Amino acid sequence: MRVLHVIPSVAPRYGGPSRAVVDMCRALREVGVETLIATTDADGEGRLTIDLGRETSFGGVPAVFFPRQWSEAYKYSRPLARWLGSHVREFDVVHIHAVFSHACLAAAKACRASGVPYVIRPLGTLDPWSLGQKSLRKKLFWHLGVRRMLDGAAAIHYTARPEQTLAEESLGLGRGVVVPLGVEVGSLNGASGFESQGRSVESPCRSPYVLVLSRLHPKKGLDLLLPAFLSTVKRPEFAEWKLVLAGDGEGEYVESLRRLVGRQGGEAHVIFAGWLEGEKRGAALRGAAALALTSYQENFGLCAVEALACGVPVVVSPHVNLAPEIEAAGAGWVTPLELDALTRTLADTLSDAGARARRGAAGRELVRRRFSWEAIARQLVSVYEVSRQEGHASS
């Protein structure tokens, strides 16, 4: 089986969705599926340094890149659209990752023209909260082709049941399937640091710390997490604790976070570590006492699963769609997005090393049972087979 994966960008700065598609293709190839990623060279305001217009390797999997010609938000690429129009018929199924992007609309249009079934993974963008952000632009896209793209899909791939429920109830969609994302446990687990060319990669902080490992974006709830954490560490018993922000975002927003920390006199307690990849990312995860993901909306939360795979408990909001599974497994703390409640939860987390160890162990078991890439790849193969046999893209 040949499956084409189309995504607007795979640059690390875009967080979990970009990383997940590379890991997904790697896992699919392990179970015998031939994959190719088609994407753009977008990397924020810059561009990835990579060959364009011909097959190359990215993250160890085959990929073909095209220039983003304009619009960081829309990532318009006429060369990508032309390539899709000529090549989608070479694949059994096309898996489209994202919705409000030129690459996605172009892929769906090419599939409909060629009679190739396609599956859409909306990345949480069909959640009512997400649709309410920059809503005028999304309404325009909706009428320009997003609704037709969704109606023509052989399946809509959600990564958590609440994501499916919210999208289907608010938009009247059907053909939904739930297949979670996975983690490559072997790439994360280890001792206190990765061994690399004879040296150990240290965690980003020698003091005990809570880790944020994601894009620095308004939806992540950092406007509440930062003051809650800084209030907590004013207590003498928590004075040595740090909050490590391992991520990047738009310059103006990151600067606003720095100002927030400065106004509260928290510079000694908050570390802006920047985006971490590879061995440094694994070391940061394993060294953390807990990971915080206090989002206003999170369709999956790959960084939380990565933390649990390392035996690190998580503090999440109810708006992280994995929160019910985390709570049921006893793998962390689910806290309302209210300043006082979040402050109390952080104090509970920091004060009880035994609880952190128990919840971390429960999290590791949850990942073993639910988030193995091998098992997930086989679930995806079933989705592709049904899509190929029962449904072709609408013309």
Where are these regions (language model features)?
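Conserved acidic donor-binding segment of nucleotide-sugar-dependent glycosyltransferases
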Residues: 332-340, 348-354
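Membrane-proximal helix-turn-helix segments that form the acceptor-binding/catalytic region
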Residues: 139-156
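Carbohydrate-associated surface elements
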Residues: 41, 162, 182
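Short hydrophobic beta-strand element within catalytic cores of glycosyltransferases
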Residues: 313-317
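Nucleotide-activated donor-binding/catalytic signature segment of Leloir-type glycosyltransferases, i.e.
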Residues: 255-276
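Conserved donor-binding/catalytic core segment of Leloir-type glycosyltransferases
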Residues: 4, 157, 197, 201-220, ...
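Glycosyltransferase donor-sugar binding loop
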Residues: 41-44, 213, 242-256, 274
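Aromatic "clamp/platform" in nucleotide-sugar-dependent glycosyltransferases that forms part
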Residues: 296
